């Protein structure tokens, strides 16, 4: 079996018994039942995922995957593709939004070149695992071969496996790739059957005329490639991206290893959607960091069955929302681990 087949075979439902045990433990804390709302949800889900009533949350990593997109030559983005490697250098210097927010929540950022059209020198903090120098223009033909899509997925699975071996408690997804809202919209349109117009927004801030053009390009790509909605690998290969594939792999690897994975915004959720279409139990391991301004994001979240943690009108990507949400998930787990019980505090319990 290859890495993908192994990961898919290992994914099991989360532990319902541990979920109930976590809730019982939370109910003994010095508070009215359920009064910490979603923080309690985060704690019990974390326990059910890991199988540990005293889970560790110390080591958190946001993997920011970078890749270029051939469809950019159609003029679908406000920025040129040269910005992708420029932003990779910004990540490595610690100057990007994800770096700032990860420092704030105590997470590490690891940058992964899975498909940038640029030759990086070996650099501390950069993982070079390039499958190709970007995708091909899916307005004219498939973005990738099926083999390339699987290879990029396996980059993500491999990173999840290494993170598990390192004792990482929580994984986060992020991305960088000029033009990558275009394949993300194509993926949700192909899988859901929604019209391209319903799921396509402004990405980096394009104007009305450019948005109409972007919609036409995606419609053309879907017509040319005819991705099979029943085959997520076919959708990914024909209209997806290398970084989206690697995110799908990281999510699959996390689920196979019983690790919580926090997905960022629209592009990250495209990867998570591919993963959950490959194995429906994947959704039980996902924490959705936030709901993006991108209109297609809600359709993705609904199909996965994930309720976003934050709604801050974010649309940057990189892993910014994932880094922020990690802090709230960790707060919920700390309530479970550190808050006193009624008995410990000598406080009378309520009668329900």
Swiss-Prot record:
The keyword Glycosyltransferase applies. The keyword S-adenosyl-L-methionine does not apply. The active site is at residue 318. Gene3D superfamilies: 1.10.1610.10, 3.40.50.10210. It holds the Pfam family DBI_PRT. It is an enzyme of class 2 (transferase). GO terms for biological process: cobalamin biosynthetic process. One of its GO terms (molecular function) is nicotinate-nucleotide-dimethylbenzimidazole phosphoribosyltransferase activity. Keywords: Cobalamin biosynthesis, Glycosyltransferase, Transferase. It catalyses: 5,6-dimethylbenzimidazole + nicotinate beta-D-ribonucleotide = alpha-ribazole 5'-phosphate + nicotinate + H(+). HAMAP family: CobT. Belongs to the CobT family. This is Nicotinate-nucleotide--dimethylbenzimidazole phosphoribosyltransferase. It comes from Geotalea uraniireducens (strain Rf4). The lineage of its organism: Bacteria, Pseudomonadati, Thermodesulfobacteriota, Desulfuromonadia, Geobacterales.
